[in-house]
């Protein structure tokens, strides 16, 4: 009889639980003033004026890891830095799902990379659609729990705030899912848009639920999308496994440097001011859109975007394109046959967007 208490590592693929991964030249802390261990060039490239790029970078830069952990409210050992949230999603699927066997649960309409990563791993995808009612879109928590249990899903992805619909999941509902699926699935909460939300982060719940995983990114509120810095926040043992599954040198030195500068106290103060402005503009833009005759519905949003249904989404889309305004066409997504997603821009950009849509109304049919 096995009386050993289950751990989060029991959810990892068995062959990876003791997987050592690749041991790179930077995997072990070494000291010395003459480094001849990684077959790097002895001279900098002529384009490298500061002579800082000839060495391989730190796999997990300690300073940046500490800054991100402080930002998100965890300890560094609970945080893995990756190339955007996309890499975190991919690592989780590869580490947890046995190909052709272990399902991944998603809640469409939702960010497509969860299903894409699952399909690349040949993991079955279980879909539990969001419910669209008078209050907007929301997660069907009882259906999520039932589907996860019935299918024996190993990963449950919850996007909160959800892209593209903008809805956030209340903490109490996430905790209900965590309580019910303890020991059977990792519950992954994607908080890419968390800075714009009224709902607090779920990171503090990690102390009680080691099967919780949180995804964060510097791409949205922190305006560093090109830098490609995302974080997986999870049980330290799981983070160690994911690191072994990760590429040896995932983080380019220039990206790390920009991220560290972007997380300085001064930069964080500017970011907070901009987030507040986006939240205010989100309300202004939403109210103005709702007054347009061609707009069928503007959904409440906890992100930096608005999902909008149009009487004629094609006409709205083409008018915006003709005016040089690019928005996201969502009509191929489940339940969104008439919807466009509009990013909240600066006040001037939002006013320009509204002017184009108002002009459509002025054109005789």
Swiss-Prot record:
Keywords: Amino-acid biosynthesis, Aminotransferase, Histidine biosynthesis, Pyridoxal phosphate, Transferase. It catalyses: L-histidinol phosphate + 2-oxoglutarate = 3-(imidazol-4-yl)-2-oxopropyl phosphate + L-glutamate. Its cofactor is pyridoxal 5'-phosphate. Its EC number is 2.6.1.9. It holds the Pfam family Aminotran_1_2. Belongs to the class-II pyridoxal-phosphate-dependent aminotransferase family. Histidinol-phosphate aminotransferase subfamily. This is Histidinol-phosphate aminotransferase. NCBIfam families: hisC. One of its GO terms (molecular function) is histidinol-phosphate transaminase activity. The modification N6-(pyridoxal phosphate)lysine is found at residue 220. The keyword Amino-acid biosynthesis applies. Pathway: Amino-acid biosynthesis; L-histidine biosynthesis; L-histidine from 5-phospho-alpha-D-ribose 1-diphosphate: step 7/9. The gene is hisC.
């Amino acid at each position: 009889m096995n009386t050993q208490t289950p751990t989060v590592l029991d959810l990892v693929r068995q062959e990876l639980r003791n997987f050592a991964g690749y041991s790179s030249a930077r995997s072990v802390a070494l000291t010395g003033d003459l480094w001849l261990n990684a077959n790097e060039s002895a001279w900098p490239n002529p384009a490298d004026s500061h002579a800082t790029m000839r060495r391989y970078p730190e796999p997990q830069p300690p300073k940046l890891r500490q800054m991100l952990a402080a930002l998100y409210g965890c300890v560094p050992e609970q945080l893995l830095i990756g190339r955007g949230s996309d890499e975190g999603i991919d690592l989780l699927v590869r580490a947890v799902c046995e190909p052709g066997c272990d399902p991944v649960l998603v809640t469409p309409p939702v960010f497509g990379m969860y299903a894409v990563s699952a399909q690349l791993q040949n993991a079955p995808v279980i879909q539990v659609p969001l419910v669209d009612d008078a209050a907007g879109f929301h997660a069907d928590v009882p259906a999520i729990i039932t589907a996860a249990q019935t299918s024996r899903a190993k990963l449950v992805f919850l996007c909160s705030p959800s892209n593209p619909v903008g809805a956030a999941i209340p903490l109490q509902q996430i905790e209900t899912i965590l309580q019910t699926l303890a020991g059977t699935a990792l519950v992954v909460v994607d908080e890419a848009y968390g800075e714009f939300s009224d709902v607090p982060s779920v990171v503090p719940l990690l102390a009680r639920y080691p099967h919780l995983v949180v995804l964060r990114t510097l791409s949205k509120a922190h305006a560093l999308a090109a830098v490609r810095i995302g974080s997986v926040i999870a049980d330290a043992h799981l983070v160690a496994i994911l690191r072994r599954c990760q590429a040896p040198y995932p983080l380019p030195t220039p990206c790390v440097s920009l991220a560290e500068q972007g997380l300085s106290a001064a930069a964080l103060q500017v970011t907070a001011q901009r987030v507040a402005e986006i939240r205010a503009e989100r309300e202004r833009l939403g109210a103005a859109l709702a007054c347009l005759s061609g707009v069928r519905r503007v959904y409440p949003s906890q992100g930096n975007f608005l999902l909008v249904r149009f009487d004629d989404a094609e006409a709205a889309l083409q008018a915006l394109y003709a005016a040089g305004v690019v928005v996201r066409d969502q009509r191929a997504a489940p339940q969104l046959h008439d919807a466009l997603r509009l990013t909240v821009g600066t006040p001037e950009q939002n006013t320009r967007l509204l002017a184009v849509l108002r002009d459509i109304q002025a054109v005789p049919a």
